[in-house]
Amino acid sequence: MADWSYGGYAAKYGVVKGGEYDIGTGHVKCCDLTEELPEFMRSAQVVFVDPPCSQGNLQSFYTKAGVRLENQFSLFLLKLFECIQEIAPQVCFIESFASNIDDVKTFISTEFRYMAVIHSHYYHNRKNQCWIVAGVNKEPEGWEDWCMSVHDMDEQSIIREICSAIMPKSTIGDLCMGRGLVGFYANKCGRPFVGTELNPNRLAVLFERIKTGKL
């Protein structure tokens, strides 16, 4: 049987479904974004999110969280976009893949005045292609140069650069925190962050990372 405990940190830190926590410089909740958008998420002026990218990927996320999947991927994506609209960030980054990039680009180009598509890869392997689709209504100082500087970087490095350089005094939010790269790097920079995550086992990894200061 597969082990999806992610190190067992949920038990160590008492992270449970529905729980809301202060951790480092951030505030997070273990919840399903298709069911609720916590009020505190609306404080995010910058959003970065790496959401499930297909029906199979979405099913895997719910299976690992021990939650029955009730929605089709198209409905999940619609709800994600609605959450971003409610937050109304000044800058939004959505990590995308071949299976969902067209939908993401359509959303970003509709909701924001300017769009940039940054080529990237994940797990430190250039064969694992992805794209960071960014939207802004008012370009931050040095925006175009920054986008060029991170082009082709590993997505982990791009997240680090976003946390340190893009409106660094503002709150950054992540609707699908996973194991918490956004929270980890925001905390490293002393930056406030907010986030939600479906799976308490995955979210609890962030607690361990912040405690140890290591990924």
Residue ranges with predicted function:
Residues 1-215:
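Class I S-adenosyl-L-methionine-dependent methyltransferase catalytic core
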